[in-house]
């Protein structure tokens, strides 16, 4: 029987019993803030149970789409690890709203299972709430189930509640006995005594009698009612004779589709875990989007994003490095579209949303995953079992890597994440952002002057032609208020009618300088321009009192201005050189020009090679040595563009613009201050090159004396290196190359010796294999310090054993390294390398973990290495089944 046929038979059966077939409600619960998603069939009838709503029927039956991911009912982390758990599933149900109660519910369930589905009655067991004598008797009376197949259980298992509050009541679960061949090793393997795959819950009958309030108090519902839920996928697995829900016709086609995309064959064991996750998540993503949820950062949208990105990550584990999940939407629709037309109607939209989210996530994942793997490797080496909050926050803040994804990946490797530390780092960032906002507020305060200065004329800037001038104080400000004077030691702002001080703009920092007047003076700490063009000087009065109307002398800090102009002119040279070397696609994306150095951001698709960096540096220095004239002119914007001047993308320009021209080499629109000729820059040195965003690179550089100092430092370092190599400086490179070649040859010889030694060591180690519960186990201390070599040795030993468990330990620099390997057949017998090594490493004050077949760990106590290895035998004995 197919899954679709099962759904149809269920609905028709209950329709024949007077039930109204009600279509599935949305996965977004209507008017119910207590639930993230619809997670059971009764959700759409909650108000009916509470007596707040009435329907034109007292009996209903549904096939309800459900999601359990997030909130109290969250199966996300167990999906794919078991044969039964899903984020998305269908719940078949029959409901009574004050119509029938326990007797009829039990009668209908038994009839459907044994007569319609023809399940063998002797395979069916039931559980009842320990205090529900009525249900206990009814199962014997109606179904003839003997008392030994009716198990009383406690509130945890047999008292159902939808959430922390709301309708609830005792329940009775119908269990299908899959047979002793599926039994576990528990003694006894019995319903209620173990939770293995032999005992498959297929139907839960909830006898809705109470409502639980926020204080945990129970009160009778207005009308006792029935709510039942049967897992469609579970019953389909029984009817189709398969071991897992993932093997049913409801999900198996999705696994086949993943096989086709990956070119890999599905393994129903642990190796097939990624296939099962992807198949499940494709279903939940499709249905969530069909019900109007889009990926985002809050609430349901965040859960969808997490599910989608989790599937994408497992696709990467299968070797898929491009968006693929959207391609499974067609398969979901082919299976489910008949029963749920909403997914078929939105098929194209669903696929598009998934693809766009996959594209965004691949950008995040590729960078963040590399960093996280490095963090986990360091933690293993250090014997840590915890990823620090700062490490997790760096992943989140710098790489956009979600905390829950960090926790999930870390957990798979046997690590925990310090969530409290993460929250502290997040709080610290918020505080930094708040402080930054305070700084911005201070700047905005200066901008706010514009509204308070409407009564005064603008400021004339005279600094292109002179560094000293005289002006009149037009206005003074202190602590956000306009004042008439500033006394000695006061800090405030002054607006003059004219000034030679350049106001911050175009990436160039504002000038500093000095004000003098009769009987007083002040330091100019910064200069800024207001939106209306007026120029504000931030000053500190060092002597006397400055009053409105005072005549003052203004002098710019010459040395600082010259250094800034040097870096600004060279920024133009750099821009042109980058275009010449890399291509005309290069455009300025930002800059910072200070007296100390320059920073230039530009559009480019890849990091610069060493050759490109040398070419850029050489070209800029050539133009400096050429002593090219730097000239400026003011013209209209249109004429400047016609002349070929470079304008910054996104920058707003007025009708009149200033053009800075460096001979025939460079011509840009710019309001900054510049040199008279390029030779005044002295020299140019690149300091760094890096990426700051998608398609944006950043270089930092120095000029003049700073570039000379950098060259002198390089020369000194070369002399030091040459001294260590005992050769003249001009022979240092040749000597290093010779040493590198010699080192390669030594490494080749060492590798050969290691292989020979490893073969010898392996033969010796194999003599020390012990048998534990019929399992060959080799715990051994080895003299291997490199973790990669340790893994390789363990792999070779496992290969030679064929079937067995290898646990190797070594010590180096006061630390311990462990590696464990388990053959495939023993993984199936319950031995898990990650769990094994986690316990072993604790003996040596360490931790770690990993997969079932391979794991690594570290420790801090080398003195406990032998004890830890000996303990591994006990752990293996406890795991094997």
Swiss-Prot record:
Instruction: For this entry, list what GO says about its biological process.
Output: alanyl-tRNA aminoacylation
Cofactor comment in the record?
Binds 1 zinc ion per subunit.
- Which GO molecular-function terms appear in the entry? alanine-tRNA ligase activity; aminoacyl-tRNA deacylase activity; ATP binding; catalytic activity, acting on a protein; transferase activity; tRNA binding; zinc ion binding
* Database matches in InterPro entries: aa-tRNA-synth_II/BPL/LPL, Ala-tRNA-lgiase_IIc, Ala-tRNA-ligase_IIc_anticod-bd, Ala-tRNA-synth_IIc_core, Ala-tRNA-synth_IIc_N, Ala-tRNA_ligase, Ala_tRNA_ligase_euk/bac, DHHA1_dom
Keywords, A to Z, come to: Aminoacyl-tRNA synthetase, ATP-binding, Cytoplasm, Ligase, Metal-binding, Nucleotide-binding, Protein biosynthesis, RNA-binding, tRNA-binding, Zinc
Show the domain comment: Consists of three domains; the N-terminal catalytic domain, the editing domain and the C-terminal C-Ala domain. The editing domain removes incorrectly charged amino acids, while the C-Ala domain, along with tRNA(Ala), serves as a bridge to cooperatively bring together the editing and aminoacylation centers thus stimulating deacylation of misacylated tRNAs.
Q: What does this protein do?
A: Catalyzes the attachment of alanine to tRNA(Ala) in a two-step reaction: alanine is first activated by ATP to form Ala-AMP and then transferred to the acceptor end of tRNA(Ala). Also edits incorrectly charged Ser-tRNA(Ala) and Gly-tRNA(Ala) via its editing domain.
- Tell me the protein family, please: Belongs to the class-II aminoacyl-tRNA synthetase family.
Q: What is this protein called?
A: Alanine--tRNA ligase
Q: Which organism is it from?
A: Moorella thermoacetica (strain ATCC 39073 / JCM 9320)
